[in-house]
């Protein structure tokens, strides 16, 4: 999962290293915004020397993995719930200003039992001014919704476990392979149909249609 190199993190990122230490040890809830501001300041400065754009994007993704994991462990660590990165974030390459696409995965009874804790986790992310796209679903709901909506299906093509229950995530991977992503030809035809429908909505002309780069990648 997270692979942050101590050669640059956190010693080179934070002017006051104690800010990160208090956060990572669960001793502070009031400096989330400060941490994110300092990290973004670092990434947009001339200080970091990454070998490639790919490394830059991976380091950003790695940092947010760690940030989310710290907050998750404060609220939902011992629960039978998984925090999964999906979509572009699931690829492990996070562009500046990109949403963090998150799937909170659990059995329905766990979602109902721990709804307040899940809400607390999400509230902390919003309070930190994180831009997130999230869903809270069971494995069965993921499969059902993805079969009915090719956009959701596409979003589940790339995914990673960030924190939480490994068994739930492994079961999720097995069900995706068995029920959703096993037939590549069917998926291709659905994507083609989606593209054609989107084209029609824009008057059947390229002069009125600007493709969504995120959809086309």
PLM region descriptions:
Residues 46-56, 102-107, 204-208:
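Glycine- and acidic
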Residues 55, 65-115:
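Active-site nucleotide-donor binding segment shared across nucleotidyl transfer reactions
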Residues 69, 115-163:
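Conserved catalytic core of two-metal-ion nucleotidyltransferases
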Residues 154-208:
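C-terminal or mid-to-C-terminal helical accessory/interaction module adjacent to the motor/catalytic core
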Residues 1-79, 97:
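N-terminal regions immediately upstream of nucleotidyltransferase
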Residues 59-66, 116, 120, 151, ...:
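Generic recognition of stable, solvent-exposed alpha-helical segments in well-folded globular domains
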Residues 209-214:
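Conserved small/polar residues in nucleotide/adenosyl-binding loops
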């Amino acid at each position: 999962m997270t692979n942050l190199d101590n050669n640059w993190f956190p010693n080179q990122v934070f002017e006051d290293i104690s800010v990160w230490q208090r956060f990572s040890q669960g001793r502070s809830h009031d400096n989330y915004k400060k941490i994110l501001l300092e990290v973004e300041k670092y990434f947009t400065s001339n200080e970091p020397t990454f070998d490639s754009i790919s490394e830059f994007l991976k380091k950003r993704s790695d940092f947010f993995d760690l940030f989310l994991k710290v907050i998750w462990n404060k609220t939902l660590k011992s629960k039978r719930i998984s925090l999964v990165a999906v979509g572009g974030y699931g690829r492990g390459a996070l562009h500046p200003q990109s949403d963090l696409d998150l799937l909170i995965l659990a059995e329905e009874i766990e979602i109902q039992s721990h709804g307040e804790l899940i809400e607390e986790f999400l509230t902390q992310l919003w309070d930190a001014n994180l831009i997130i796209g999230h869903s809270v679903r069971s494995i069965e709901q993921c499969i059902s919704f993805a079969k009915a909506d090719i956009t959701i299906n596409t979003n589940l093509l790339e995914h990673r476990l960030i924190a939480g229950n490994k068994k739930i995530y492994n079961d999720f991977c097995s069900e995706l392979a068995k029920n959703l992503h096993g037939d590549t030809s069917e998926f291709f035809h659905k994507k083609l149909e989606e593209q054609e429908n989107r084209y029609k909505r824009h008057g059947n002309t390229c002069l009125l249609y600007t493709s969504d780069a995120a959809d086309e990648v």
